[in-house]
Amino acid sequence: MQYKKPLVVSALAATSLAAYAPKDPWSTLTPSATYKGGITDYSSSFGIAIEAVATSASSVASSKAKRAASQIGDGQVQAATTTAAVSKKSTAAAVSQITDGQVQAAKSTAAAASQISDGQVQAAKSTAAAVSQITDGQVQAAKSTAAAASQISDGQVQATTSTKAAASQITDGQIQASKTTSGASQVSDGQVQATAEVKDANDPVDVVSCNNNSTLSMSLSKGILTDRKGRIGSIVANRQFQFDGPPPQAGAIYAAGWSITPEGNLALGDQDTFYQCLSGDFYNLYDKHIGSQCHEVYLQAIDLIDC
């Protein structure tokens, strides 16, 4: 896949905090290719859950419950690592976001990614849970459960490592998430069959997860992702997926070109696979393979409901 060269940005030091002004609008920081059949506008907010590419190919496309990713205060997205979450849309755990905007995911449950306050996104490994976001905007995911990602306050997205859950968002903006799988049925002649699923082209999201304050909750409009604090979902200089700004942080590679595929996964340009890379107890999410602790995943879009 061919991408446009990232636009050059200039740093301004008018105050003790660095700011930057792109030479062109940051919304032009987009891949050159687009995903066939992808939708760039979605009518409601949604979370994401981490699903391993290897297991996704063999899983049944039936209704299931997942946890959403969480977000911490920095904007990171994170996901949990070991537990699986709970419903005719199937349910998943959402990723969480911490305050910095990162997205993270947990190690062993499939949970949704969370976002911490700095905007990073993190996610967990094996349960299906929603990603969470911490305050810095990062997105992280847990190791083993499929849960939704969470976001911490910095905007990172993180996900846990062992359960499949939806992501959540913490105060720094990070996104965290865990993961899940679906089962097959057996008919009387002994054959094992997977249920066929028909998706609505206008609404390919067929999984739901419980929403909470740390769950990464995103909006998609004209190919631009924003979290509940209005920060921009971007691929930053180190290839990590997190939420910052607006505008995105200096050196951001992509800040637009997002879509939801006909299969219900988040895509950037014509790419619908990402990488969760282990960082302590959480995975950070990237658009490229950056090391031996990285695994290819899908970021499954999930509708968020009050539980």
From Swiss-Prot:
Pfam family of the protein (one): PIR
Molecular-function GO terms, alphabetical: structural constituent of cell wall
Example of a GO biological process term: fungal-type cell wall organization
Site (Cleavage): R67, A68
Cellular component aspect of the GO annotation: extracellular region; fungal-type cell wall
Residue windows of the PIR1/2/3 repeats: 66-84, 92-109, 110-127, 128-145, 146-163, 164-181, 182-199
Domain of life: Eukaryota
Localisation: Secreted, Cell wall
PROSITE patterns on file: PIR_REPEAT_1, PIR_REPEAT_2
Signal sequence coordinates: 1-18
Modification note: Covalently linked to beta-1,3-glucan of the inner cell wall layer via an alkali-sensitive ester linkage between the gamma-carboxyl group of glutamic acids, arising from specific glutamines within the PIR1/2/3 repeats, and hydroxyl groups of glucoses of beta-1,3-glucan chains. O-glycosylated. Extensively O-mannosylated.
This protein's UniProt keywords: Cell wall, Cell wall biogenesis/degradation, Cleavage on pair of basic residues, Glycoprotein, Repeat, Secreted, Signal
Chain positions listed as propeptide in the UniProt record: 19-67
InterPro entries recorded: PIR1-like_C (IPR054508), Yeast_CWMannoprotein_PIR (IPR051153), Yeast_PIR_rpt (IPR000420)
Sites marked Covalent attachment to cell wall glycan: Q76, Q102, Q120, Q138, Q156, Q174, Q191
Note on domains (UniProt): The PIR1/2/3 repeats are required for the covalent linkage to the cell wall. Their number varies among different strains of S.cerevisiae.
Similarity section: Belongs to the PIR protein family.
Function (record text): Component of the outer cell wall layer. Required for stability of the cell wall and for optimal growth. Required for resistance against several antifungal and cell wall-perturbing agents.
Protein name: Cell wall mannoprotein PIR3
